[in-house]
Amino acid sequence: GGVLEPVNATPVIIEDDVLVGGNTGVYEGTIVRERAVLASGVILTRSTPVFDLPNERIIKAEAGGSLEIPAGAVVVQGSRSVSSGFGKDNGLSIYCPIIVKYRDEKTDSSTKLEDYLR
């Protein structure tokens, strides 16, 4: 359950067999496709770019659309360096979610405990 705030906010959709780790936030305008894994501490919003390492691309929401996490993606929390000005001068970084791989047999065996607990 949840509340759409502001009124024009787009919903969150989490498809079947998604594993959501503790302290994870999935907010307005985010779609998580089936069998994805969101590791502990991952924060996803429509305005958050997601860095897909296996496919060497950046996933962003289209104007007015939703951020879509691909089916089977394994997403962890990460950071990227601030590349200009004060941030660069002080070695600052910004949070970013990173897809490190897509589900495989090893991932499935690691998440099997979740099935037993259901």
Residue spans for each PLM region:
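C-terminal catalytic lobe of FAD-dependent flavoproteins
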Residues: 90-118
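Structural signal for interior beta-strand "rungs" in well-ordered beta-sheet cores
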Residues: 1-87, 99
